[in-house]
């Protein structure tokens, strides 16, 4: 299966890129600059492409992102600290982000005669992000079948959509994913902050998977208190 992977440079998408490279035919990685404050993640995506020996397509959609106002990832709004399940994390939603990225990626895949576009959405994303849920993935795949009917046959591959981030870590170990060469923190500082939703989820995932976390955090222990009040929640 000739596959293009949407890769942000984060733990999930880099792990997916390594998985695809091992199990299928990885054609390229595609990343998006949408004006995110944690733009340094894109350097990790570029490094992943170089490591796997495939092209890296960096697509600038900053002019679109500038109009998707109200998100802590793109606006002058503080990135909240805490667990992903907290209501404050809704401020990190960039409306329709995955739908926009996937639409572009499908066009690229059709032009390059790929069989699939792969995305690393997972079960831990469901509570906050509607465009990471199984219902969205299935509906988008059906929509694209109509959009490209008679021109190209490209499918959406989302192998992590119903599993936890800890399961991704466990799976990624099999493919030698270099966890230290991934970036998750939404704040985009010199080091992972250890306090934002993605840092908390990242640290918790390594703990639950029983895998050593090589990440340096500004606050390495915040995740313990942040996760105590929450159990994994699924939204379909």
UniProtKB/Swiss-Prot annotation:
Pathway: Purine metabolism; 7-cyano-7-deazaguanine biosynthesis. It comes from the Bacteria. It catalyses: 7-carboxy-7-deazaguanine + NH4(+) + ATP = 7-cyano-7-deazaguanine + ADP + phosphate + H2O + H(+). One of its GO terms (biological process) is queuosine biosynthetic process. Zn(2+) binds at residues 185, 193, 196, 199. It is an enzyme of class 6 (ligase). InterPro entries: QueC, Rossmann-like_a/b/a_fold. GO terms for molecular function: ATP binding; ligase activity, forming carbon-nitrogen bonds; zinc ion binding. ATP binds at residues 7-17. Catalyzes the ATP-dependent conversion of 7-carboxy-7-deazaguanine (CDG) to 7-cyano-7-deazaguanine (preQ(0)). Belongs to the QueC family. This is 7-cyano-7-deazaguanine synthase. It comes from Agrobacterium fabrum (strain C58 / ATCC 33970).
């Amino acid at each position: 299966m000739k596959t293009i992977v949407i890769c942000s440079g984060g733990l999930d998408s880099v792990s997916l890129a390594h998985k695809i490279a091992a199990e299928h035919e990885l054609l390229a990685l595609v990343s998006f600059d949408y004006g995110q404050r944690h733009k340094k993640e894109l350097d990790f995506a570029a490094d992943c492409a170089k490591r796997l020996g495939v092209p890296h397509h960096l697509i600038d959609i900053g002019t679109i992102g500038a109009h998707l106002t109200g998100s802590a990832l793109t606006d002058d709004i503080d990135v909240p600290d805490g667990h992903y399940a907290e209501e404050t994390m809704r401020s990190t939603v960039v409306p329709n982000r995955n739908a926009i990225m996937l639409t572009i990626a499908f066009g690229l895949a059709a032009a390059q005669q790929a069989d699939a576009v792969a995305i690393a959405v997972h079960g831990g994303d469901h509570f906050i992000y509607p465009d990471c849920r199984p219902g969205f993935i299935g509906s988008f795949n059906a929509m694209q079948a109509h959009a490209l009917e008679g021109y190209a046959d490209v499918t959406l591959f989302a192998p992590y959509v119903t599993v936890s981030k800890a399961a991704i870590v466990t799976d990624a170990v099999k493919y030698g994913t270099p966890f230290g060469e991934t970036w998750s923190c939404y704040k985009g500082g010199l080091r992972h902050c250890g306090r934002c939703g993605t840092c908390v989820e990242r640290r918790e995932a390594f703990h639950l998977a029983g895998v050593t976390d090589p990440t340096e955090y500004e606050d390495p222990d915040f995740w313990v208190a942040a996760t105590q009040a929450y159990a994994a929640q699924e939204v379909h």
